[in-house]
């Protein structure tokens, strides 16, 4: 099985969600990632993946793989903040590489 690590940025974002249904749906998708079945996603440049959650404003979770047994959850957002969230995810990946 895969180990999932949350960045502090991701953890703060998820804890800040007020919509309990949205939070529950996101957590279900994270558990699916844990068993290597992420569902609807796309791969972005730099090894970052975008998980799409079709609920509410279109939530997104950005993550990357580190070796074959670790997933790092980078940050989250929704369709309206997508461009900024991708840039933030790229920045977090760079920090983890340093």
What kind of feature is each model-predicted range?
Residues 1-3, 48:
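A residue-level signal for beta-strand positions that form part of recognition/binding surfaces
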């Amino acid at each position: 099985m895969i180990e999932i690590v949350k960045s502090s940025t991701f953890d703060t974002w998820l804890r800040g969600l007020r919509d309990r249904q949205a939070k529950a749906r996101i957590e279900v998708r994270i558990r699916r990632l844990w068993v290597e079945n992420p569902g609807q996603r796309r791969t972005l440049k730099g090894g970052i993946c975008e998980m799409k959650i079709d609920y509410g404003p279109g939530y997104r979770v950005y993550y990357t793989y580190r070796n074959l047994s670790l997933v790092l959850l980078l940050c989250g957002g929704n369709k309206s903040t997508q461009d900024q969230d991708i840039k933030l995810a790229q920045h977090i990946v760079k920090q983890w590489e340093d």
